[in-house]
Amino acid sequence: MVRRNLQSDFVGGAFVFPGGAVDLADGGAEAESVCRGRSDAEASILLGVDSGGLAYWMAALRETFEEAGLLLAERPAGPALLAGDPEEEARFVAERARVNAGTRRFLDVCRDESLQLLVGEVHYFAHWITPMGAPRRYDTRFFVAAAPPGQQAAHDAGETIAETWISPRRALEGHRKGDFEIIFPTIRNLQAISRFATSRELLEAAEAASSSVPTIEPRVLSDGNGVRIVLPGDEGYDDVRVDRPVGVAPNFNDAVRAISRAANHDDGATAGGVSAPPLSAPPTSAPPVAEPPLAEPSEGAIP
């Protein structure tokens, strides 16, 4: 996980999975030519979109490279990528800096280095949409993948200011204690991951379920019992006012933090003890899209 810059507009200082917006260069035939293991048609079916689905995978891998320095790719012939060659590592550090600065396309790095992005090993895991009424909304697809062997994660010292490998249970416990800030969708994703004993089990389950990932669009309310999140299917979900994400917190970041502090159970319960099945199909609205992937070492246990 990486820690967001303290000056970020959205929950600065929180720990998140690497991610960001899908760029135009993430899609199209040129991008598909550097991807292996999944076609645009296959990706689009999984996401429930007409076309352009592969761009989400491309964005996830690009953002993981930009923010965490991990590159889920390989050359068709040759040694493992970034596995101890100092000259190669220095070259990719420089390429990463150029991509982050906007002077070099990630696509061009892959093409010039003869890389194939391992999109077939990255599995669609979760879909969250920011509650209606929020001043800034995100339509976010989450992915899981094994970390590439031999590579060392490193934050970018720009959008992110720290990185850590941490087990889901430790992250959730740190959140409960107040010394590891994470937000509600991250909490729920970590709760889901924590149910698996190993990364291998998680990846196998994610692959098997990737064609039926539900969309979760919470609604947030404040009443005499405090701040609560209601999910699709919960009693009162359709009655929640949507003109403000949290009635007692007009500042969006304060609202997000209040909700996330309340969601302090690691048994799947939501804030206020409300839990329910999510939607089975995406809504018709299409706010901006962000693509954070999740990653764990491929053989490591998940304590």
Model-identified regions with their sequence ranges:
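N-terminal leader/linker segments that precede catalytic domains of diphosphate-processing enzymes
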Residues: M1-P287, E291-P303
